[in-house]
Amino acid sequence: MSPSNFTRIVLNSRPVENIEPDTFRKEVVPFNLKPGNGQVLVQVTWLSLDPAMRGWLRDARSYLPPVQIGEVMRAGGLGVILEAGPGSKYKPGQIVHGIFGWTEYVVVPDKALDLIVPPKGAEPLDFLNTLGSPGLTAYFGLKDVGQLKPGETLFVSGAAGAVGSLVCQLGKKAGAKVIAIAGSEEKVEWLEKDIGVDKALNYKSPTFHSDVKKQGYLDVYFDNVGGDMLNFMLTRLKKNARIVFCGAISEYNASQPKGLTSYMNLISQRAKLQGFIVFDYADQYQAAREDMAKWLGDGSVKRKFHIVEGLEQAPKALPMLFTGGNTGKLVVKVSDGPAKANL
């Protein structure tokens, strides 16, 4: 039986710097959703919170159009099909992945969905983490852009986050020396004891710069932070080093982001700094997921989720990504889904 109303969260105002309490607005609207031809009605169960979402709040040119004022906040997630419209290839009870947004229910066209069939050793939620965008970003960023080789030294910033922690693990699997950078002693301990990096460093430590220098120069730097961290790491390059420019989480809330000051080292060390977008590798997702699922199954790659309960908590949870409040993949549990879901 369908509810009489449902909740969704929309963009209320564009933040200049930090996400504020009035950035988003909750709406309770009548339930009048009905799938049309080639569409399905989905009950959202899980939503992914990712640093890229901060960029979607800016009214600026990017790889995706910005979320408009009054629109449901964009987010990827998992859901269960409640009803399939005429001509749909899906069936009620199937679990799907899509860009559902911050809402409890949504009508989505078939072409915008992926059916979730977890391989051995995996579970549906892994498609928001290791088998989803974070895992694929780590996989292709390190393999294609970083071109990491056995015996090389890899530094990873934002190492306790979803992407960073997976980069660390893939770096170890590739036979590299892995130095992880995080923002608390608890995260340092987790990275060394649970993730298995060679050394984890706390960037808030007064000895951080000297601690980095003790680890020698780097072959690959996987950058999730940008700003002062990137400028410092550009002074630590070996000849022919590669910088994988994945994100700049320290800059996303800045009204005037800092520019590069150490870029001349790219010339002197014949180094390369390259940005990338994981969507460009869509034709290779299946092969990457097969690898990652195998490693999940044999335990050589570990998963960690930071779970927030309830859709209404999403606006409060999103800023955690920019203050170091999460360890592992940050997700929102929206609902358990219907009892008939094929879990």
Residue spans for each PLM region:
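Short acidic-hydrophobic, aromatic-tinged amphipathic segments that line or gate anion-handling sites
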Residues: 199-204, 306-313
